[in-house]
């Protein structure tokens, strides 16, 4: 049983969804029905139970329009309401198919959806809609078994006002037009967990960026996006070489408006990305490598429960860094690993400070907990470090061969960590390496809170140069011998590591305002375009009490809604100027995605 779902796939399993919906921007609603096909897997099952949250259910029919009885459970404050649909007596045997149409509409409180007015878009001409279903928000888009333990095919027929375009995480199969509306049809023939269902409706334009890829965005941003993501096909090709053939057909990218709360979301066929990646020099394209890696890790081999999220994210980070290493030199793998360890350390410290250390276990107990509340770098970086440790025991070539075999074996399935562990042991026992892998303390890796129990040593000369500049030139020597040329030859990742090292190493004893002013006069960090630099520089300045940065922080906070940036920055601003932090959030919270707004409110104690 999935503790994050109220549904019953272990008794009656949904196999496909067919969505027929109209997009109503005046009411901020999707209206229509979903046809749910399911199969009985437990003899005598009387009900199909679906997850819903903030949906209005009108009625249920069978395919011949006969009414079917249903009821909604009491509302659970995290997981919503169960929609309990009666299965006719003749269809309660194992293997029988039960098809029901659920007529419904979404509401303004459906937190999978963000409705933007035309003024909140880049073009200012048309409204915009986008979804974000991970982790447990698909149930506020469509009644479904909203658990990664169950995978479904889906089709859709979406009616939108002209001249807008609809896209989904599915193959576009057609468009028909009438006087004032267009109908777009889609099909997704590969079964996917419901958190990968996605929709966007807006004034969208596309450019071809590869043999199987386009980038989509509002017209004013499409040229910048075309340039920024030009290496997409290279990433896919390396992923295929490392793992298995890419099975999804297309790989398109959608550049979203600034309020999108994540860096990227791996919706199949249509990765969603934040405009904060538009650095102008392709320096932040690693996020695209990450989302491409999800085409295998997460989208094909899926964590069965959200507590085992590292099976999605730890594997994806590992493959992402393998891709970047193969393209840009093997040192890149170690460099990114060292950077990731810093982020992991910060999150472990944060959860420990909040007395939630149990959420730093690789497999935390999420009973009754919204997975969003447990979101951190732990499944990403601690999961990645587990794989690096396993690789160190068996060797790179053999581990990569196992990884390819693992993807082949578990594709199209949802699995638990013990299946991964058992297959690792079985595979390397057959290869004669049982002695090398006998040292793995799986129980502690999976269940012990805190930093990884074994530390792989990562080596990167480029990282050492960046760290030395931070620790010796600036922290030890206070910038006395610093020059403009210090970072002239630095790659983007080195500047990020330099700033991260400063933040991390001065947490107890901040740099003085005079030192930061000198640093800014040499390196010009206050006026950078790159969002990763800006976020770190502003964090550093707030921590040191550089008052003049506060208006710049507010400017950045209201210009985008990526949680990676807004949550820590609001927390830092709240420490030094709580009145400004709270008034800024209260004034602009309606511009943020509902997930981001909820999390920032918690961070600020509102």
UniProtKB/Swiss-Prot annotation:
Its EC number is 3.4.11.-, 3.3.2.10. It holds the Pfam family Peptidase_M1. It is found in: Cytoplasm. It comes from the Eukaryota. Zn(2+) binds at residues 290, 294, 313. A peptide binds at residues 132-134, 261-266. One of its GO terms (cellular component) is cytosol. It is an enzyme of class 3 (hydrolase). Its cofactor is Zn(2+). It catalyses: an epoxide + H2O = an ethanediol. The active site is at residues 291, 380. One of its GO terms (molecular function) is metallopeptidase activity. Keywords: Cytoplasm, Hydrolase, Leukotriene biosynthesis, Metal-binding, Metalloprotease, Protease, Zinc. InterPro entries: Aminopeptidase_N-like_N (IPR045357), Aminopeptidase_N-like_N_sf (IPR042097), ARM-type_fold (IPR016024), LTA4H_cat (IPR049980), M1_LTA-4_hydro/amino_C_sf (IPR038502), M1_LTA4H (IPR034015), Peptidase_M1 (IPR001930), Peptidase_M1_C (IPR015211). GO terms for biological process: leukotriene biosynthetic process; peptide catabolic process; proteolysis. Binds 1 zinc ion per subunit. Belongs to the peptidase M1 family. Aminopeptidase that preferentially cleaves di- and tripeptides. Also has low epoxide hydrolase activity (in vitro). Can hydrolyze the epoxide leukotriene LTA(4) but it forms preferentially 5,6-dihydroxy-7,9,11,14-eicosatetraenoic acid rather than the cytokine leukotriene B(4) as the product compared to the homologous mammalian enzyme (in vitro). This is Leucine aminopeptidase. It comes from Dictyostelium discoideum. The gene is lkhA.
